[in-house]
């Protein structure tokens, strides 16, 4: 059977919170089959566990934020994206603040941590959410959509109308049957505009944001000396975000995702719309790994990645 996965050993790192600017400790721990991805605020007098789920996402203005009883864990999308890319079903994520450290602004550090810990198959069938009917959410000209597809593919279009972004790819289509998440998506960094960063700092946000963890643009150009990691890094990062946003549903999706100018809020609304229609999806497992879509019947160390 195609099995669930966790990590083999505990792994730790320290990074900066993009909004608080503070040093944050992050610990990843193995979890039993059926646990899911569970975030734990271990800095509180009594630690609070917040399982990743579509219904636990609250604030989505600047990141995907998990909330439970007034306790928050922000900026979960890059770590969730790495878990999706490496096929991690079960994981405890201990964090000492209300945000996951930003690291280099991509998912690459989290991929490295998980691969360093080692990936272990578990004696339980991996559960997929198979989309059986189209589901769509629109907001003005923005939209996000899921269609039935035996596999996982994404098509994302952006439109920032900025000279530096316009010169790069504005549209990307990826099918993980034939594309490596680790090589092609994981290293794409978040990006932002210098004038927006100043405004955010004035209201106490983005205190940890810098060219060490983001692509920074002024009105005309990229300010980072080292340029881009991919020719189409902007749209690739939006896809990286979408993969993480979608993975909070708790299982990998078997679906085709299409989006135009979507963000964390629209992605979460799409998941809620899917879950609201029980006839639009079903839970499936694969007794024979070879019967799973290409890209999911991976060996123990890689991903649809």
From Swiss-Prot:
For this UniProt entry, the molecular function terms from Gene Ontology, in alphabetical order, are:
metal ion binding; UDP-3-O-acyl-N-acetylglucosamine deacetylase activity
Top EC category: hydrolase
| Pfam families listed in its UniProt record | LpxC
* Swiss-Prot/TrEMBL keywords: Hydrolase, Lipid A biosynthesis, Lipid biosynthesis, Lipid metabolism, Metal-binding, Zinc
- EC numbers: 3.5.1.108
Biological process according to GO? lipid A biosynthetic process
InterPro entries assigned to the protein according to its UniProt record, in alphabetical order: Ribosomal_Su5_D2-typ_SF (IPR020568), UDP-acyl_GlcNac_deAcase (IPR004463), UDP-acyl_GlcNac_deAcase_C (IPR011334), UDP-acyl_N-AcGlcN_deAcase_N (IPR015870)
Pathway in which this enzyme or protein is active: Glycolipid biosynthesis; lipid IV(A) biosynthesis; lipid IV(A) from (3R)-3-hydroxytetradecanoyl-[acyl-carrier-protein] and UDP-N-acetyl-alpha-D-glucosamine: step 2/6
A GO CC term attached to the entry: membrane
Which cofactors is this protein said to need? Zn(2+)
- Catalytic positions? 264 (proton donor)
Superkingdom as given in the UniProt entry? Bacteria
Q: Where does Zn(2+) bind?
A: 78, 237, 241
Q: Catalysed reaction per UniProt?
A: a UDP-3-O-[(3R)-3-hydroxyacyl]-N-acetyl-alpha-D-glucosamine + H2O = a UDP-3-O-[(3R)-3-hydroxyacyl]-alpha-D-glucosamine + acetate
What does the sequence similarity comment in the record state about its family? Belongs to the LpxC family.
NCBIfam families attached to this UniProt entry: lpxC (TIGR00325)
| Function summary | Catalyzes the hydrolysis of UDP-3-O-myristoyl-N-acetylglucosamine to form UDP-3-O-myristoylglucosamine and acetate, the committed step in lipid A biosynthesis.
User: What is the official name of this protein in its record?
Assistant: UDP-3-O-acyl-N-acetylglucosamine deacetylase
* Source organism: Burkholderia cenocepacia (strain HI2424)
Q: Tell me the lineage of the source organism.
A: Bacteria, Pseudomonadati, Pseudomonadota, Betaproteobacteria, Burkholderiales
């Amino acid at each position: 059977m195609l099995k669930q996965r966790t990590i083999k050993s505990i792994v730790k790192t320290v990074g900066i919170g993009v909004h608080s600017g503070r040093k944050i400790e992050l610990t990843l721990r193995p979890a039993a089959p059926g646990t899911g991805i569970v975030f734990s605020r271990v800095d509180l007098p009594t630690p609070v566990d917040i399982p990743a789920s579509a219904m636990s996402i609250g604030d989505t203005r600047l990141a995907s934020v998990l909330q439970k009883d007034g306790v928050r864990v922000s900026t979960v999308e890059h770590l969730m994206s790495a878990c999706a890319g490496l096929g991690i079903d079960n994981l405890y994520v201990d964090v000492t603040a209300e945000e996951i450290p930003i690291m280099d602004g991509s998912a690459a550090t989290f991929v490295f941590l998980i691969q360093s810990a080692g990936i272990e198959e578990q004696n339980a069938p991996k559960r997929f959410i198979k989309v059986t009917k189209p589901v769509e959410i629109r907001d003005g000209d923005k939209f996000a959509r899921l269609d039935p597809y035996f596999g996982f593919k994404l098509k994302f279009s952006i439109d920032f109308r900025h000279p530096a972004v316009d010169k790069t790819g504005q549209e990307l289509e990826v099918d993980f049957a034939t594309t490596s998440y680790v090589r092609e998506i994981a290293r794409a960094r978040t990006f932002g505009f210098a004038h927006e960063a100043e405004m955010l700092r004035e209201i106490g946000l983005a205190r940890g944001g810098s060219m060490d963890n983001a692509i920074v643009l002024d009105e005309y150009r990229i300010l980072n000396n080292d340029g881009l990691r991919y020719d189409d890094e902007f749209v690739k990062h939006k896809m990286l975000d979408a993969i993480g946003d979608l993975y909070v549903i708790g299982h990998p999706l078997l679906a085709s995702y299409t989006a135009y100018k979507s963000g964390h809020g629209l992605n979460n609304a799409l998941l809620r719309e899917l879950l609201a229609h029980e006839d639009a999806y079903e839970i499936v497992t694969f007794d024979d790994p070879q019967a799973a879509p290409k890209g999911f019947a991976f060996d123990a160390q890689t991903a649809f990645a």
